[in-house]
A protein has these predicted regions:
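C-terminal beta-strand-rich structural cap/linker in extracellular carbohydrate-active enzymes
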Residues: 510-531
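Active-site clefts of carbohydrate-active enzymes
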Residues: 351-384
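Aromatic- and acid-rich polysaccharide-binding/catalytic face
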Residues: 110, 116, 308-342, 400
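Aromatic/acidic polysaccharide-binding cleft in carbohydrate-active enzymes
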Residues: 364, 378-431
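Carbohydrate-binding surface patches
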Residues: 453-493, 522
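Glycan-recognition and catalytic regions of carbohydrate-active enzymes
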Residues: 410, 420-469
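Aromatic, loop-rich ligand-recognition surfaces of beta-strand-rich domains
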Residues: 145-204, 210-265
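Catalytic domains of carbohydrate-active enzymes, especially glycoside hydrolases
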Residues: 53-87, 91-102, 320-325
């Protein structure tokens, strides 16, 4: 059950009309962009709900108009930012692009955006492992795996004959013995005669057995070094010229592997780098907000890259370098897990807590399948109902802008992949959101409200006060998509009062401070009661 606990007010018959349709109007030139007291965008003094498309070319402008989007974020075309923004302006659309001094002052420039996902995790190692001449690198098997301590992983050496890698350590070590962990796979060459050189001096020549596992070799005398080079001088031939290696190890007098350098996760852009870019942008153009999009790795449920302590340190630092914070998670497109749709809502709640009450928050929402992370024959469809549910989850939890991710990679690449039914559904949804934006972005209602679904199904709601009316935006959050009856308790609501169901052509009759309604799985309803 979700609750607001705030002062009470009285309500009477709801006789007000629905907000007038304004969806089709081209957007006017921007004189001023502000952040309002409800963490909303305000353009020329009026509340504005950005409905964004990500990284589209100018050729996709008709697609954006077809779904009722109002903002293109990221320049996905070949035009320079200045020309790109002009193309958007000519079609009544706003643009958000990477900072570009040449693009400043454009009539439809809504804001600037940092490089995408600065928090995206990458693995680094304290040891630098460098390839020798002629070695072809395989990005899926990075060289640092050779000293990561994981014996079941491997690194491709292509070609294996004469392959050479150099391990550079942060500080000198002294070893008494060395180890080589081979991988043996059908059809692949296997290392046979190998050599080790430390600081340019040979310390070991060895012949390896054609078998898996560690092969250990004592040195004639201890060797001290910070740079160790391993070379394959001959191979057990295979059908392929390439082979692989699992680990190199070096043991000190105590028997510890002092070559061991487990990788760790770090953001691809350090907070200090993002902060410097933010200061540069704000110094050059203080008139426009700076946006950022994060991955979902700030969420409590995701600690596979950053543990809780790292999350708590990293993300507040990032947050200080933006005016608007967003994130992306694609439960079906990225994970094939429709049961994860709730994470869109949870992510917005957690991001809102990080952003604070005054910073706008946005969420990127999936619209289609075709990801490179799920096999094409296994990919589930992203349905219009899924996308609509995710959008409302984000808005109810506090997002004040919505973005749509429309790219696909399979079976072929497209910037804008939604078709047919999804395009029509997005147009209906975005037109509705454009109409409702003043109410959605209004101040929280000064009323005590409770919502409970039958059978204790999960639910949530948002309530605002706009132009003398109480607005309630409510949703069934049950991931099993069960239907439930919602009971709303609204302090001050008079028995017999009519509650308008916005955009549904029907109304409800209140009991004494209460009304009920049916909610299909993941469905939302919008209610209006006159104050």
């Amino acid at each position: 059950m979700s609750k607001f606990l705030v002062p009470t007010a009285s309500f009477v018959l709801a006789g007000l009309s629905v907000l007038s349709a304004i969806a089709a109007a081209p957007l006017p030139p921007i004189q001023q962009v502000e952040i309002g007291k409800n963490a909303e965008f305000r353009v020329n003094g009026q509340p504005f709900l950005p409905l964004m498309l990500w990284l589209q070319s100018e050729a996709r402008i008709p697609d954006g108009l077809a779904i009722g989007a109002n903002t293109f974020t990221g320049n996905g075309g070949k035009l320079g930012n200045r020309e790109y923004l002009k193309a958007l302006a000519d079609n009544g659309l706003y643009g958000i692009v990477d900072f570009d001094p040449e693009a400043g002052g454009q009539s439809h420039l809504l804001g600037w955006i940092h490089g995408d996902e600065p928090d995206l995790a990458k693995q680094v190692s304290d040891a630098e492992v460098l390839p020798g001449a002629g070695l072809r690198l395989n990005s899926s098997t990075p060289l640092f795996r050779i000293v990561d301590g994981v014996a079941h992983s491997w690194t491709v050496l292509d070609p294996l004959q004469d392959a050479e890698v150099t391990v550079k350590l942060a500080k000198p070590v002294t070893v008494k013995s060395l180890g080589v962990w081979l991988t043996v796979s059908a059809g692949l060459a296997v290392a046979k005669d190998v050599s080790f050189t430390a600081e340019g001096q040979g310390i070991l020549n060895a012949t390896l057995k054609n078998e898996k596992g560690e092969q250990h070799f004592d040195l004639e005398k201890p060797a001290t070094f910070s740079s160790l080079t391993f070379r394959v001088r001959s191979t057990y031939p295979g059908e392929q010229v390439w082979g692989s290696l699992s680990e190199l190890s070096g043991y000190d007098e105590a028997g510890d592997n002092v070559l061991l350098s487990p990788p760790r996760w770090v953001p691809r852009s350090a907070p200090e780098e993002v902060s410097a870019e933010y200061r540069k942008i704000k110094q050059a153009d203080p008139t426009r907000p700076v946006l950022v999009t994060f991955t979902a790795h700030f969420m409590k449920e995701f600690t596979d890259k950053y543990d809780q302590a790292t999350q708590e340190k990293l993300y507040p630092e990032f947050m200080n370098s933006c005016d608007v914070a967003g994130y992306d998670i694609y439960p079906i497109f990225g994970w094939n897990k429709p049961e994860w749709l709730y994470r869109v809502a949870d992510g917005v709640s957690e991001l809102r807590a990080l952003a604070g009450p005054k910073r706008p928050v946005h969420a990127w929402i999936e619209t289609n399948k075709g990801s490179q992370w799920v096999a094409p024959d296994r990919q589930l469809d992203v349905t219009p109902k899924d996308t609509r549910a995710e959008v409302w989850m984000a808005l109810i939890r506090g997002a004040t802008a919505i973005g749509y991710f429309t790219h696909r990679w399979k079976p072929d690449y497209k910037q804008f992949a939604p078709e047919g039914e999804m395009v029509a559904a997005l147009k209906r949804l975005n037109d509705q959101l454009t109409r409702l934006a003043p109410a959605l972005l209004a101040a929280p209602a000064a009323t005590r409200i409770e919502m409970k679904l039958s059978d204790d199904l999960p639910c949530h709601f948002k309530a605002t006060s706009h132009e003398g009316a109480l607005w309630i935006f409510a949703q069934n959050m049950d991931m099993q998509k069960r239907t439930g009856t919602a009971t709303f308790r609204v302090d001050g609501l008079k028995a017999g009062a009519k509650i308008e169901e916005v955009d549904e052509g029907r109304s409800l009759t209140a009991g004494d401070a209460v009304f009920t309604d049916q909610f299909e799985g993941l469905a939302e309803h919008v209610y209006r009661l006159a104050e």
